């Protein structure tokens, strides 16, 4: 656990040898629930624990889903992202039925929205039509300032708090804490 310069925010950074964890998890009888067991009691110290997962449904993501209470699903405003979303929602159902009955979907967040393109509008319309209130009201625009922030080791809201992307993520955070 590493403290940050931001009050009440600590991080557990990923490491290059995290790939070896996949092999280790496969060897363990409790491999699918290892992270859940490791995080038991974390709520006593932290109000929120966020697990940033790779965009695949491998063992690390399954472990995170088994440990989570809720899952926030980011979806890029692009055609193929819709296909991946269907697959992910099915995986969430599978994890819920086999490993974690308390798992729920906090919402679907539309990201990389380009207001100049018809595609972004079409994807947003389809998501809202099919998923309704599950889709966050706020969307995150495609933004150079968002893309720059990691290179400075900063969250977007610290890199440029007035940027459209930082403001969008602030709205998402407020909406997330309001949702059950």
Predicted segments, located by residue:
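Short, conserved glycine- and acidic-residue-centered signature motifs
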Residues: 28, 81-84, 165
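C-terminal boundary of histidine-terminating zinc-finger modules
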Residues: 150-171
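P-loop/Walker-type NTP enzyme "switch/lid" segment
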Residues: 1-44, 99, 103, 125, ...
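Active-site donor-binding loop signature of nucleotide-sugar glycosyltransferases
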Residues: 14, 138, 142, 161
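Conserved catalytic-core segment of NTP-binding enzymes
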Residues: 40-144
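Charged catalytic carboxylate motif
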Residues: 34, 87, 168
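C-terminal alpha-helix
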Residues: 171-180
């Amino acid at each position: 656990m590493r403290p940050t310069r931001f009050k009440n925010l600590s991080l557990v950074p990923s490491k290059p040898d995290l790939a070896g964890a996949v092999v280790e998890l496969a060897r363990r009888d409790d491999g699918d629930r290892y992270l859940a067991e490791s995080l038991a009691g974390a709520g006593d110290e932290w109000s929120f624990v966020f697990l940033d997962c790779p965009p695949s449904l491998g063992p690390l993501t399954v472990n995170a889903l088994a440990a989570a209470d809720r899952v926030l699903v980011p979806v890029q405003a692009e055609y193929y992202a819709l296909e991946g979303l269907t697959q992910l929602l099915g995986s969430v159902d599978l994890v819920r039925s086999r490993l974690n009955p308390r798992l729920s979907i906090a919402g679907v967040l539309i990201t990389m929205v380009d207001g100049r393109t018809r595609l972004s509008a079409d994807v947003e319309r389809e998501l809202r039509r099919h998923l309704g209130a599950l889709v966050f009201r706020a969307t995150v625009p495609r933004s150079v300032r968002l893309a720059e922030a990691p290179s400075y080791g900063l969250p977007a809201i610290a890199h440029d708090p007035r940027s459209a992307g930082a403001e969008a993520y602030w709205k998402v955070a407020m909406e997330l804490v309001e949702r059950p």
